[in-house]
Amino acid sequence: MSMNKGPTLLDGDLPEQENVLQRVLQLPVVSGTCECFQKTYNSTKEAHPLVASVCNAYEKGVQGASNLAAWSMEPVVRRLSTQFTAANELACRGLDHLEEKIPALQYPPEKIASELKGTISTRLRSARNSISVPIASTSDKVLGATLAGCELALGMAKETAEYAANTRVGRLASGGADLALGSIEKVVEYLLPPDKVESAPSSGRQKTQKAPKAKPSLLRRVSTLANTLSRHTMQTTARALKRGHSLAMWIPGVAPLSSLAQWGASAAMQVVSRRQSEVRVPWLHNLAASKDENHEDQTDTEGEETDEEEEEEESEAEENVLREVTALPTPLGFLGGVVHTVQKTLQNTISAVTWAPAAVLGTVGRILHLTPAQAVSSTKGRAMSLSDALKGVTDNVVDTVVHYVPLPRLSLMEPESEFQDIDNPPAEVERKGSGSRPASPESTARPGQPRAACAVRGLSAPSCPDLDDKTETSARPGLLAMPREKPARRVSDSFFRPSVMEPILGRTQYSQLRKKS
């Protein structure tokens, strides 16, 4: 209750006094700014419930602090009321003076922003005009003076050329050039007679050229001579290439190579034409498919048909080249065509060279990204199994050849074989007696055979299982040898035991090789 008594007393003491804070808050600029801050605060507060709870807590804290400050400052305000009144009056007078000097304080923020924008744009426009107008006028003057100087120089050059041509020396020089050019034309006509097909259009062209002007100019004659020489050179080159190609096609094996070269050139042109497109994995599949199709078509077609098609293509290319050459009536056009062709070739080469590394890297990267780890591991496992199978087949073939072919020191024949005792097993007493012996005389009589067998088996197997079995039986004399059961007959026994010969490898290793293969 004491907190609300202070303002009521102040209002009772000064009922008609204006407050500076209220006037400042009522200004459009300040009120608009406060509204903007209030909207921002409300939107932030409504963004999340946690933020709203925190803001409410701070609001309550600030309200409590302000109430406490007002309650504590109430005695001071009562004692200094006269001083506060005087300061308020002075502040109100200053605010009135500011409103008179700056009327924009009474404008809304939107109006102030529009007026400020218009003022800035007009200032910038005036500054730009002040800079660009003198530059434009100066450049126009400079260009006019330059054009006038160029026209004057051209006029002087023309007058000088006409004067030099009308002099005696000029007439002699032009006559000498005309005589030399005429002699060159006669030599060219004598050495290079025109074709029958091209004689009619060339004569018609000469008639059309001679009709408007009796004597052609020197430049036109030079251009005609250059076109004639270039056309004859290209015709001669095309004929020589055609003759060489026809002769080379008679050589056996050249036709497939030429077709393969044409396919490679077409594929390279396709790659160069697609240099701006993205590098994708299906591009490789398309190239492979087109390669297979072209290869099948080429193998199906006969040699005569390919020769006829190539001759037709070459004739069409020659006609196109001749048309391009005849379409250039002046040396400027001929040189321009040559320069254009060279420039286009250089551009294609440079673009292909710059695109090739990026294409290769992009293709490799896409293949690596598109290939999963499981596919890589499965492919690797299949490759390893295939290599093991091939190795097993190779070892089996080598062992079979060594077994059947009577090579010196390689084919080992053991009459007392493991397979020989299957039908007639020995008695138990004989087994005991044989088990008490340290070693059999046959095994000691030929000590070099196991080494040779191991040497032969080193091509396929890392160890000698038969030798290990014999050493183990000799090293254990005390064990009782039980009669072995007769194994079941299999189809492969006829392959591994053609006679009493013992196979080089053991049965376990042969079974492993069969499983691998």
Curated annotation (Swiss-Prot):
Phosphoserine sites (modified residues): 81, 126, 130, 132, 137, 174, 315, 385, 387, 411, 434, 436, 440, 460, 492, 494
Biased composition (Acidic residues): 299-319
Tissues with expression: Adipocytes.
Modification after translation, per record: Major cAMP-dependent protein kinase substrate in adipocytes, also dephosphorylated by PP1. When phosphorylated, may be maximally sensitive to HSL. When unphosphorylated, may play a role in the inhibition of lipolysis, by acting as a barrier in lipid droplet.
The UniProt record lists the keyword Lipid metabolism: yes
Purpose: Modulator of adipocyte lipid metabolism. Coats lipid storage droplets to protect them from breakdown by hormone-sensitive lipase (HSL). Its absence may result in leanness. Plays a role in unilocular lipid droplet formation by activating CIDEC. Their interaction promotes lipid droplet enlargement and directional net neutral lipid transfer. May modulate lipolysis and triglyceride levels.
Lineage: Eukaryota, Metazoa, Chordata, Craniata, Vertebrata
Segments for region (Required for interaction with CIDEC): 291-322
InterPro entries in UniProt: Perilipin, PLIN1
Protein name: Perilipin-1
Annotated family: Belongs to the perilipin family.
Compartments where found: Endoplasmic reticulum; Lipid droplet
Alphabetically ordered keywords of this record: Endoplasmic reticulum, Lipid droplet, Lipid metabolism, Phosphoprotein
Positions bearing Phosphothreonine: 85, 224, 299, 301
Biological process terms in GO annotation: cellular response to cold; lipid catabolic process; negative regulation of lipid catabolic process
Gene that specifies this protein: Plin1
Record text on subunit structure and interactions: Interacts with ABHD5. Interacts with CIDEC. Interacts with AQP7.
Bias kind Basic and acidic residues: ranges: 483-492
Region (Disordered): 197-217, 285-321, 415-495
GO CC annotations on file: cell periphery; cytosol; endoplasmic reticulum; lipid droplet
